[in-house]
From Swiss-Prot:
Sequence intervals crossing the membrane: none
Organism in which the protein naturally occurs: Halobacterium salinarum (strain ATCC 700922 / JCM 11081 / NRC-1) (Halobacterium halobium)
Disulfide linkage: none
Family recorded in the similarity comment: Belongs to the UPF0179 family.
PANTHER family from the UniProt entry: UPF0179 PROTEIN MJ1627
Taxonomic superkingdom: Archaea
Protein name (record): UPF0179 protein VNG_1401C
Length: 148
């Protein structure tokens, strides 16, 4: 399980984030090796906060940074219903301009891209919307965690 550094506001078990790589302010930081050891574009979940560790100075996080355990996590997403079952591969249906839709966060989920096929780990059922404005027949699924 990878150990990385996060700001205290994010350092809670269950918090999920997508690692986007180093910020410009990371240049020259003495903690780069411990902090920038994740895979870009992967969604992670904080599983534990290291107790007794000190808060390190950090140019990115205004309250400093603390050591946490993280692991790649599933990505809740909507996929076309046809052929969607646990164990199969699935892709996102495509971009959606309807940001007010209750399913939008699943149609364009953080940590997933439109041009990638993902392993479906689990079927969650019907998406939260009553009707898709793009007339898509969608199923809510969990994409398997990314391989490290």
């Amino acid at each position: 399980m990878p150990i990385t550094l996060l700001g205290p506001r994010l350092a809670d078990p269950g918090t999920e984030f997508v690692y986007h790589g180093p910020a410009d302010d990371c240049e020259g930081c003495p903690y780069r090796q411990q902090c920038l050891n994740l895979t870009e574009g992967v969604r992670y979940e904080v599983t534990d906060v290291r107790e007794g560790g000190q808060v390190l100075d950090c140019a990115v996080h205004d309250e400093g940074a603390v050591a946490v355990d993280v692991e790649p996590t599933t990505i809740p997403a909507t996929v076309p219903s046809k052929g969607a079952y646990a164990g199969s591969k699935g892709k996102l249906a495509g971009p959606c301009p309807h940001t007010e839709c209750p399913s939008h966060e699943f149609c364009e989920p953080a940590g997933a891209s439109f041009d990638t096929e993902y392993q479906i780990a689990e079927i969650d059922g019907e998406p939260p919307h009553d009707h898709c404005a793009l007339d898509r027949d969608l199923t809510l699924v969990e994409f398997a965690p990314a391989e490290r």
